[in-house]
């Protein structure tokens, strides 16, 4: 034992290393691994950051980073009030709000239902305003524009009555809301604004903005008080556009969108919206019975603060007779046309062309088609022909009032007496008014697919795009 200790005391360093080489190997392996990890940590950290950034951008696109802008747009139509809340990223792409791409709320009746009580008219928006503002982050509310665009229903009340209501709405926003109100935030939209906003909305959602005009789609929007037609035309047609009659808006609006200049034919036909057209058609028969009213019905139709007799003929409703009355109300008369091509009432039709080859038809066209049962109300778009409206009209005109709910279960009770009238008018508007062939395919649109979402195809989105783009 002593000899062994003596030998151990005289071992060289090399001998010791050789004798304990196994132990040293075991100790050195984790040390080397730790050193390698420390050496590689900066590179690994960068890689992790890049992966996280890529994944976040893949999940949310450009929407998940950078500033966001909100816009609150009220559509004060003749048939009701609606509010849209949109959120955009820095590239003007829509950002989801909760589980939808917009907040959309509506209620009835519209502002024009209170022509003699401006305060009550304005207060009808309170519920919509409170819910819309609550959806905007608190810190962004002072810079979030709010607009109230009144359409044809309010225009029909006359200047003074409509201005009194608008002033009451301005006072409501000022006293109740923290949202940003611009100088012209509350106004009656003119026809070119409403029509052009609708065109921008649908082409924005279809992602056709920035493409040649012939790749865009034309839009017909049938509201309650007016109907708008808008489509892009070539520059040479815009240069030769006739001057509108005094008091009418210009036929052509120049717009610069997504890096391309468009010449947009747009015209709004006041008093030709569906609810206004009912009044015009009832005016034709004056105080006598009307061939467009459902058999067995006798009542009064109210629109724009006026009452109109709405009573069926003793022989019942008649599609052919109703068509005659509708054509009369539309003023389809070529002698009024002083241009090469007209729609009705002597109005230039824009000349047609590539921007009109694909027509998207919105609002009441979709609603009545769904209620009449020839399109699925749960689908955002449907391809139909004007003939489909005529076929549905034939069924509605042969209906007695008491069998209305069984034949047309989706139609609201208040609309049943006028279903024959509505469908005949829509067919007449498309074929005799806008000159479409009865067999031409058109696209009825309620919502437009935008990524994984379906967005309401209404003019407020076009207004919101303009609002958030303004300095």
From Swiss-Prot:
Q: Which residues form the signal peptide?
A: none
Q: What is its main location?
A: Golgi
CDD domains in the record? ASKHA_NBD_AtAPY1-like
Kindly report, in one word, the top-level EC class recorded for this enzyme: hydrolase
UniProt-listed InterPro entries: GDA1_CD39_NTPase
Query: As annotated in Swiss-Prot or TrEMBL, what is the tissue specificity of this protein?
Result: Expressed in roots, root hairs, root cap, leaves, stems, trichomes, phloem throughout the plant, guard cells, filaments of young stamens, stipules, papillae of stigmas, pollen, pollen tubes and the abscission zone of siliques.
What the record says about family reads: Belongs to the GDA1/CD39 NTPase family.
Please describe what this protein does.
Answer: Catalyzes the hydrolysis of phosphoanhydride bonds of nucleoside tri- and di-phosphates. Substrate preference is ATP > ADP. Functions with APY2 to reduce extracellular ATP level which is essential for pollen germination and normal plant development. Plays a role in the regulation of stomatal function by modulating extracellular ATP levels in guard cells.
Protein name per Swiss-Prot or TrEMBL: Apyrase 1
> From what organism does this protein derive?
Arabidopsis thaliana
């Amino acid at each position: 034992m002593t000899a062994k200790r003596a030998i151990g005391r005289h071992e060289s360093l090399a001998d010791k290393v050789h004798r304990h080489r196994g132990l040293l190997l075991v100790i050195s392996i984790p040390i080397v691994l730790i050193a390698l990890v420390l050496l590689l940590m900066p590179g690994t950290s960068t890689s992790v950051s890049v992966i996280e950034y890529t994944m976040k951008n893949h999940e949310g696109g450009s929407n998940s980073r950078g500033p966001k802008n909100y816009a609150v747009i009220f559509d004060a139509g003749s048939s009701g009030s609606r509010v849209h809340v949109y959120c955009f990223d820095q590239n003007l792409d829509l950002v989801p709000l909760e589980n939808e791409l917009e907040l959309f709320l509506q209620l009835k009746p519209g502002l024009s239902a209170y022509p003699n009580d401006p305060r009550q008219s304005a207060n009808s928006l309170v519920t919509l305003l409170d819910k819309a503002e609550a959806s905007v982050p608190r810190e962004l509310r002072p810079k979030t524009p709010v607009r109230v665009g009144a359409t044809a229903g309010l225009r029909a009340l006359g200047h003074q009555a409509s201005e009194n209501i608008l002033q009451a709405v301005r006072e409501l926003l000022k006293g109740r809301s923290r949202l940003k109100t611009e100088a012209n935030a509350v106004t009656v939209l003119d026809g070119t604004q409403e029509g052009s906003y609708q065109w921008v909305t649908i082409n924005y959602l279809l992602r056709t903005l920035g493409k040649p005009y012939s790749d865009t789609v034309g839009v017909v929007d049938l509201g309650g008080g007016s109907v708008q037609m808008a489509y892009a035309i070539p520059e040479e047609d815009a240069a030769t556009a006739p001057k509108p009659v005094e008091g009418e808006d210009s036929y052509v609006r120049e717009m610069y969108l997504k890096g391309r200049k468009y010449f947009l034919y747009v015209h709004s036909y006041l008093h030709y919206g569906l609810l206004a057209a009912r009044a015009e058609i009832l005016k034709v028969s004056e105080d006598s019975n009307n061939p467009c009213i459902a058999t067995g019905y006798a009542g009064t139709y109210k629109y724009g603060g006026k009452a109109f007799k709405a009573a069926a003929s003793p022989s019942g409703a008649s599609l052919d007779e109703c068509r005659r009355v509708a054509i009369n109300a539309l003023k389809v008369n070529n002698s009024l046309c002083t241009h090469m091509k007209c729609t009705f009432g002597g109005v230039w039709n824009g000349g047609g062309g590539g921007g009109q080859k694909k027509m998207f038809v919105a609002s009441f066209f979709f609603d009545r088609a769904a209620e009449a049962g020839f399109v699925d109300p749960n689908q955002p778009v449907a391809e139909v022909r004007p003939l489909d409206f005529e076929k549905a009209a034939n069924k509605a005109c042969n209906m007695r009032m008491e069998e209305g709910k069984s034949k047309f279960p989706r139609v609201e009770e208040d609309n049943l007496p006028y279903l024959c009238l509505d469908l005949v008018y829509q067919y007449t508007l498309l074929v005799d008014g806008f000159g479409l062939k009865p067999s031409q395919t058109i696209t009825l649109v309620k919502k437009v697919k935008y990524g994984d979402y379906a967005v309401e195809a209404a003019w407020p989105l076009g207004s919101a795009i303009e609002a958030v783009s303004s300095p």
